[in-house]
């Protein structure tokens, strides 16, 4: 079976570093990877933050997230990083695709680096200890930051 590439469906838009929207996706799971790839394909200057430096390096070399989306070749303009400060600073939008059990902790870690960025939660579910929605956690941990939520029945391989 031939390898499937996103570009077989849609021709990617070239990234213009001067005018491109600067997006970071926090979380290298299947949904975070799919959303980061979609942003890159649509001409955004896109980074994906992955906790593991070796995995980030492998994605940058192979353009494949072998653990979560092994059958998809990612856009060459998508950059994976493992440094949270680098991932968040000087970005326009931060998409958070972190599991709900780690969501609050990651927001606390990025709080010192957030200035005018908008934060959008892609995370499903509620926080187990508090039963808080992810939007409530954003409001608590980043009270001055504009935020949004993307939700619905989405499968990463369909995006």
Spans of model-derived segments:
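NAD(P)+-binding Rossmann beta1-loop-alpha1 motif at the extreme N-terminus of oxidoreductases
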Residues: 2-72, 81-82
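Rossmann-like NAD(P)(H) cofactor-binding subdomain of soluble oxidoreductases
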Residues: 74, 81-89, 93-159
């Amino acid at each position: 079976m031939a390898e499937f590439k996103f570009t077989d469906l849609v021709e990617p838009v070239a990234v213009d570093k001067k005018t491109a929207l600067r997006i970071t996706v926090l979380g290298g799971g299947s949904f975070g990877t799919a959303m980061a790839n979609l942003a890159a394909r649509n001409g955004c200057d896109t980074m994906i933050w992955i906790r593991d430096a070796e995995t980030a390096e492998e994605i940058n070399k192979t353009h494949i997230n072998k653990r979560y989306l092994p059958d998809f070749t990612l856009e060459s303009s998508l950059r994976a990083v493992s440094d949270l400060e680098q991932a968040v600073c000087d970005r326009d939008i931060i998409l958070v695709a972190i599991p709900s059990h780690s969501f609050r902790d990651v927001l606390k870690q990025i709080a010192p680096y957030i200035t005018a960025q908008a934060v959008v939660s892609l995370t499903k579910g509620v926080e187990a200890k508090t039963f808080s929605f992810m939007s409530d956690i954003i409001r608590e941990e980043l009270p001055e930051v504009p935020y949004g939520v993307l939700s619905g029945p989405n499968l990463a391989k369909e995006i």
